[in-house]
Amino acid sequence: MATITAAMVKDLRESTGAGMMDCKAALTENDGNMEAAQDWLRKKGLSKAAKKSGRVAAEGLIGALTKGTKGVVVEVNSETDFVARNGQFQGLVKMIAQVAFDVGADVEKIKAAKVGDVTIETAINDAIATIGENMTLRRAASLEVSQGVVSHYVHGAVIDGAGKMGVIVALESPGKADELAALGRQIAMHVAAANPLALDPSGLDPAVVKREKDVLADKYRQQGKPENVIEKIVESGLKTYYKEVCLLEQAFIHDTGKSVAQAVKEAEGKVGGAVKIAGFVRYALGEGIEKQESDFAAEVAAASGKK
């Protein structure tokens, strides 16, 4: 058997764009034959997948799955919205959500987990090779309670449990599971619409709160208000801010005459026990990803060899 050197792995990686470990495996499987190793990578779709991995993937689907006291939400990105309507891609997202439910929300653990004899990472690469677009498991999150429910809501669903936005909400309660699930779904819909930053003021980033205080204070200093008056105005302004960005203090979208906290308290009678919102996660597709702008005319010119 030929000795596989670092230089050989480097050369194969440069010629195919495949990962280092994949290149080493390809050379080992093919007794150091470079051309055979390249073909091996192509057959497995790894060379093609790696070449596409540099392209921006900002579309795709959010997958959400909840069962009883546990729930997960995942984001799987593709390059175009068209792929989100592809049955293979949709199945991949649902499979990833199930694996995340089983092994936890660590992205690397999810990618290493196997479904049958195939890892999730391999399944993603196979889909890239088949569909022809870059894809990536971007992030995952999970919530769990000791008693109660975790509910979910998917906005813009293209299939059950997958769409353009996904929310999971955890409710701790000894109450009736069916009533809790219904309440949890209502709150998840609220989170999707209202986009709270935290459950309550204590969960806000101190830097965000400081920035808000500074903006308010500077505004009234420019108006010539004395410092003792500014302090009171800022405190009042912060209370208004909390009502805008903290879930428990927001006006409930299903009944704007009460806050989310009040709505939850009023639901306790129907639920049959005290209810506490233990947490929530809201994923909107592509948030924070800078999408690539394309010049269609330039692409056509490039394809035809013109400048």
Swiss-Prot record:
One annotated GO biological process: translational elongation
InterPro entries named in the record: EF-Ts_dimer_sf, Transl_elong_EFTs/EF1B, Transl_elong_EFTs/EF1B_dimer, Transl_elong_Ts_CS, UBA-like_sf
Gene3D superfamilies: 1.10.286.20, DNA helicase RuvA subunit, C-terminal domain (1.10.8.10), Elongation factor Ts, dimerisation domain (3.30.479.20)
CDD domains: UBA_EF-Ts (cd14275)
GO cellular component: cytoplasm
Pfam family, one: EF_TS
Any one Gene Ontology molecular-function term assigned to this protein's record: translation elongation factor activity
Protein keywords: Cytoplasm, Elongation factor, Protein biosynthesis
Disulfide linkage: none
Keyword Cytoplasm (UniProt): yes
Region described as Involved in Mg(2+) ion dislocation from EF-Tu: spans on this chain: 80-83
Localization annotation: Cytoplasm
Domain of life the protein comes from: Bacteria
Function: Associates with the EF-Tu.GDP complex and induces the exchange of GDP to GTP. It remains bound to the aminoacyl-tRNA.EF-Tu.GTP complex up to the GTP hydrolysis stage on the ribosome.
Family that this chain belongs to: Belongs to the EF-Ts family.
Protein name per Swiss-Prot or TrEMBL: Elongation factor Ts
Lineage: Bacteria, Pseudomonadati, Pseudomonadota, Alphaproteobacteria, Hyphomicrobiales
Annotated gene: tsf
